[in-house]
């Protein structure tokens, strides 16, 4: 460390530290602050004065203590050993921190992000003399039931002069050498604020299926898309995200708990290892990475945690996998931006947030997408961000900025949550811009008439919502029979189609063929009942028909028995209403 790269603490304001004498320092350099060598990052430079955000508690830090720059940006180490891991916001493994310092994170602690002693069974897929580019696949390593592909760093490439034979290696061992003398290891570093390069971005065409009927049918997300889940406190943002993490069809899940309650991360840690992965039969944690940055951890690390999470997601995307990133919650991240901005005495914008809030959010969400990697693989990162507007006010800056950026908007409703309606997503206040993109996929893979059925369901729900307003004013007796049928069908759609039981092993997640069958059954009931009304049958006789109970039980029928059950109910609908008509 040269003298020019060493400065002294000039002033301290919470996580913001001003250091003078920082000659040769660069923007976003990582620095070590004070005698305890706290981790910090330079976020502004004026001459030789650096403004540093410190990722640890600055209590006890004094003016005049040394500040040393490492000359390197905030980076994460990418390689085998990340799956089944839980990290803090700057990729320090919490289990190793606990071994070193107990239940609370000691200041200035330095631990390795990856296990440096564990040996991995490496099988090369290249040989000496081959030419490799950035993010090329050098070989594979088995990690649980997952094939971990070993990549060259995105900014390295050339002709290989030596490749290690198949065998067991640690992440520090050299497994290949380039012509320019660069040694390649099982792991490499990458700065979190720099998006990993790709060959091209692809038009999304595959759906990201969540197992939730309301999302997969009415408001779908594409593989590589972005979605926002805004909602007031207690409306189920975290539960919805955890459910998507469990049942979504992504290969890898990165879950970032950004400024949320510690108990929520504890729930994930306790629950995920016990959950069986439907793809592999093993624990769900074996394809999950958790980044825990709870509300009592230093505020500056929140700002880094979402970048850490998306960089890990991009690394697995570059291996040709589909990755889902859950950010819970981006509002806490924005609050961290606001606090640091105010400490630096920057000019505030709306509600005290910095003027660059929208740009920061856009830079984060734009790192999602379906891509062709530099190695020619197809990969995708889908980002689902929770937003926690204070008091449920959807007009506040974070929600509005997110609304402009994301392609799907899943609005949570506190009223539905209070009525124990899960998932508590408001079907009249949500939307998805990906619906027309996925129509062709649904026609080919689910049913030729799927888009039309979905539109009919959406129309019925809207009609029911407007009729409910009339009912609340004058009561149901003022409605005509046709309108009462719309209300009854809307109730069935709400309670027996959109609502799911998260504790029921069958109903917690639903496949698209089952969703399609349920849609056809519900609409068949409506069509047959409407025809019966025209033939003079009373609405009370229709509503009391026992077939309605069979329709309500359909969602609890296991997948293996569902098609036979659906056929029997459809036949019964035919005979029941024909009998009534006669």
UniProtKB/Swiss-Prot annotation:
Catalytic reaction equation(s) = ATP + H2O + 4 H(+)(in) = ADP + phosphate + 5 H(+)(out)
Positions binding ATP in this chain are 231-238
Q: InterPro entries per the record?
A: ATP-synt_VA_C, ATP-synth_a_Xtn, ATP_synth_asu-like_sf, ATPase_a/bsu_AS, ATPase_F1/V1/A1_a/bsu_N, ATPase_F1/V1/A1_a/bsu_N_sf, ATPase_F1/V1/A1_a/bsu_nucl-bd, ATPase_F1/V1_b/a_C
Xref: SUPFAM superfamilies: C-terminal domain of alpha and beta subunits of F1 ATP synthase, N-terminal domain of alpha and beta subunits of F1 ATP synthase, P-loop containing nucleoside triphosphate hydrolases
Taken from the record, one Pfam family name reads: ATP-synt_ab_Xtn
Specify the superkingdom: Bacteria
> What GO cellular component is one of the record's annotations?
proton-transporting ATP synthase complex
Example GO BP: proton motive force-driven plasma membrane ATP synthesis
**Entry keywords, A to Z:** ATP synthesis, ATP-binding, Hydrogen ion transport, Ion transport, Nucleotide-binding, Translocase, Transport
Q: Which CDD domains match?
A: ATP-synt_V_A-type_alpha_C (cd18111), ATP-synt_V_A-type_alpha_N (cd18119), V_A-ATPase_A (cd01134)
Q: What is its EC number?
A: 7.1.2.2
Tell me a Gene Ontology molecular-function term this record carries.
ATP binding
Describe its function.
Produces ATP from ADP in the presence of a proton gradient across the membrane. The V-type alpha chain is a catalytic subunit.
**What's the family?**
Belongs to the ATPase alpha/beta chains family.
Q: What is this protein called?
A: V-type ATP synthase alpha chain
From which lineage does this chain's organism come? Bacteria, Thermotogati, Deinococcota, Deinococci, Deinococcales
| Gene label | atpA
